[in-house]
């Protein structure tokens, strides 16, 4: 149950932060209260490292909807532990950084940290979920919380557009992911991820295997900003920098990669998956690194660099996916090397990219700009950030003595050995190496170019709006700590490799500790080999390009004619146009029109059900005994109902409608149900009175003459609806699928202590229904109250 308690702790902290919203003095400490959640979460995961290394996994399963195998199924293994550590430890730094970044006087701190806590809670849920539907719920929660965080400064138009764009693309991917999970359930009959992976060989032979893979890939590519779905990530940079440092470099964008790692033992059985992921990753890596060079905004450079680095990791996920087809032959060592390298670089990227974002945030916060055309010579003002960002950028570029060099070497080693695989010949291997090396050169170029344009050159204070610029040490602390980790990981890589990456590799492989024999030992020096030569080539050419070429002009000419963002905007505008037309066609302010649409949909669903399972048998209908009173009431009700179709006077219609309600009251009396009769009488009386009282507030609408065609159509609709309801009564009488609950009602007094069966039903047997019905009424009341207050502030308006 420890995982449940962990999630509950995060929710509790969220509630405490929510409480600070109503207290002005407490708002200032909302960030420090929120900091408790990542500290507790990271402490928990660190304490579980020894257990996971010994293959002692933590699992919790609580029934939710067991009939369709949807349960609160949580599991902590090596892969979820690694991602959990990244989410929580980076979270500690980002939460603290955010307390210094946001203004205590102008920013709504509790609201921001509630959103951030919701996101962290959702990400933890994704990585420990062992049920596909539960994972999907958390998956969409990350999209919702990301939308809220990107639009935090909602008065900014860029924030609004970025939030909508990211939400639409990631939710589209989420729906595709859900489709893939449903296909998996159709194939296997289970939603439990471990059970699904155990059936991987049977699943791979199913005709729906490839469609399922494509759906999961859509979910992963949209979430992890892979080409051509990458366009949401640069627009998301309108969010506060702590959001960019956390969501868009270290956590949310890694969710798609986590998904593919989790299902690698299954997905890797298909060459379609291997080719698609590998080449989409390479294209994304190349496109992102090239596009980063045409940016003026520091966060824009980092956004495209993140896209490029995600493409690099995705390439390794694709190359290593073939392990599912070679779990015990001579190629196993290569596949495990690639998967290990992908996990290693994922960790390294979280460290150096988060440090870069924090550095950019400090520069922007203190100087008021992120434009590299204005930021020359900033090393004189931000000496600590100069060192932090220089080391982080060089690590991203793959320079020796920094952690990025180790994983970049492993990446290049993987590319050079691709020709040993069954899926790749000499030509494909040459293409893969060429794209990988070119993208690596461009990565080195934009990394050094960013540092050169920001920190080197002549400093001119007149370019800045703020004339007093300083570098707060407390603000810089999280970035400095991350910077120190960069060389530490390089010099002691196997500490992280053995305690974090090895258990994750076991989980990805699907065979546990048996994979240990193939896991590489991370070394800083492998001798002079092809990957080292390629690294030297990357550094030399990258230095020349970064210091000599004017990349703004070059890449602007290359990319300006192929803007995917313009295509997205055109599609979005068309979507808005057709949506507006559809809304205008449906929402014509005529209540009877709305009711007919609702009834039509209801009848269509019922008819579809009958066509699918068959129509009810009329000869099996059981008709209860009835007397003269029931006959009279039925005839009176029928006459009143038909009259309502033709009558135009409001008062008469309300009175007749009330008479139908009173007739129902008499029905209840005839059936010896006095409580229901009394309730119906009171409700009907109050409703009728409220209708009549409201007449004085209603506008004068000209009386419309009766139209024979319209009235005939209304009668037909009424008859069809009546026949549908009667047919459902037939079905209810003939249904025998579920056990009777009459025994509960017979024992109502003993079970509930209630002498009134209706009270027992509402207060005990269906207590949750009653509670949620009351909650719906409360929410509706709050909505009406809000609208009335809004009207009072805006003034009286006849349309309102």
Curated annotation (Swiss-Prot):
| Gene Ontology terms describing biological process | monoatomic ion transport
As recorded in UniProt, coiled-coil segments are none
The question of whether Chaperone is a record keyword is answered with: no
Kindly list the places in or outside the cell where this protein is found, as annotated in its UniProt entry.
Cell membrane
GO MF, any single term: antiporter activity
User: Its GO CC terms?
Assistant: plasma membrane
User: Which residue spans traverse the membrane?
Assistant: 1-21, 29-49, 78-98, 109-129, 133-153, 167-187, 209-229, 241-261, 272-292, 300-320, 336-356, 387-407, 424-444, 472-492, 528-548, 595-615, 627-647, 651-671, 676-696, 712-732, 768-788
The yes or no answer to whether the keyword Cell inner membrane is present is no
Just give the chief location class.
membrane
**Superkingdom of source:** Bacteria
Membrane association type = Multi-pass membrane protein
- Quaternary structure and interacting proteins, as annotated: May form a heterooligomeric complex that consists of seven subunits: mnhA2, mnhB2, mnhC2, mnhD2, mnhE2, mnhF2 and mnhG2.
Q: What does the sequence similarity comment in the record state about its family?
A: Belongs to the CPA3 antiporters (TC 2.A.63) subunit A family.
What is the designated name of this protein?
Putative antiporter subunit mnhA2
